[in-house]
Amino acid sequence: MSDEKQKKSVLEKALKRIEENFGKGSIMILGDETQVQPVEVIPTGSLAIDIATGVGGYPRGRIVEIFGQESSGKTTLALHAIAEAQKMGGVAAFIDAEHALDPVYAKNLGVDLKSLLISQPDHGEQALEIVDELVRSGVVDLIVVDSVAALVPRAEIEGAMGDMQVGLQARLMSQALRKIAGSVNKSKAVVIFTNQIRMKIGVMFGSPETTTGGLALKFYATMRMEVRRGEPIKEGKDVIGNVISVKIVKNKVAPPFKTAQTYIIYGKGIDREYELFNIAVEESMVERKGSWYYYTTLKGEEVSLGQGSSNAVQFLKDNPEIAGEIERRIREKYGLLSVEKEEQKKEEKSSDEEAS
């Protein structure tokens, strides 16, 4: 027997023993087509952010961190993710460590309150134990922890005011994430942590900004999104919302450092049609002629969206089939079709080849 065949035989026996001891799938050949699957995602609820992620949303089986300053839209993005997971028939949980969830606002964003799992834990250990249990159950698709800054260790709560508790929260997060990271990949759940920005004292060079909870979350997170509040959105003299910018500062499933701009309306969440309209204009799918906007359908028909951007956006709200077609074309351009749609297209292609 040649050395090459002998090595192959020994390797096959070793792989077989590993699978017998630790279960099927505990070790695999990466190039095996049956093992390599497209990245499954839960949409973010924003087309612009879906594009920035590079895969069309939050990757399943991974940990995601959304961080930013106060009132920058972190919880809004998390609630939109819950609404999207529920639309797909999934189960979502909200760990309200801040004890600040507004059910009316969540409902306005499309969250089904009747099926939403919610917990308002007494301390950080309890919150993270609940997350771990939900992940290990294997039936929860999305878990949101709002927020890391509010995960106060039990020792700090039970201690007196002014007691020094150095690094307690960082150690808690490090220990919990070691447990959660291993099981989240097997369960195909998405765990989203929202986090706040703090200022480091005495920093002379570089950014003085940092996030709470130590370094563990930065390490274990597959995707980290920085959210910043931009200029206000006005209707006449009244401020009705804010432009927010999102930067993907870490991404293990696609190229990082992409940015997105979206629009949050107070009490309503992301203005999807306004966002869609702006992207369609940038991609030249919607054409401007003077002050009028036009869209040419896949059938070749030119449709007038209206005079001025506000009328064009209203047209998209009144005609969801046109808005849906534009969104599908944009997603197809960026390769963001869902796994189900891609598999359906492959099946249609193979059936066409067989017929021919």
From Swiss-Prot:
Record's InterPro entries? AAA+_ATPase, DNA_recomb/repair_RecA, DNA_recomb/repair_RecA_CS, P-loop_NTPase, RecA-like_C, RecA-like_N, RecA_ATP-bd, RecA_C_sf
Q: Which SUPFAM superfamilies match?
A: P-loop containing nucleoside triphosphate hydrolases, RecA protein, C-terminal domain
Compartment(s): Cytoplasm
Q: What is its main location?
A: cytoplasm
Q: Which GO terms describe its biological process?
A: DNA recombination; DNA repair; SOS response
Entry binding sites for ATP: G68, Q69, E70, S71, S72, G73, K74, T75
Question: Would you name any one GO CC term?
Answer: cytosol
Question: Domain of life, per the record?
Answer: Bacteria
> What UniProt keywords are attached to this protein's entry?
ATP-binding, Cytoplasm, DNA damage, DNA recombination, DNA repair, DNA-binding, Nucleotide-binding, SOS response
A molecular function (GO) held by this record is: damaged DNA binding
**Known role:** Can catalyze the hydrolysis of ATP in the presence of single-stranded DNA, the ATP-dependent uptake of single-stranded DNA by duplex DNA, and the ATP-dependent hybridization of homologous single-stranded DNAs. It interacts with LexA causing its activation and leading to its autocatalytic cleavage.
Q: Which family does it belong to?
A: Belongs to the RecA family.
Among PANTHER family, the record links this protein to:
MITOCHONDRIAL DNA REPAIR PROTEIN RECA HOMOLOG-RELATED, RECA
Report the NCBIfam families cross-referenced here: tigrfam_recA
Q: Which protein is depicted?
A: Protein RecA
The encoding gene is recA
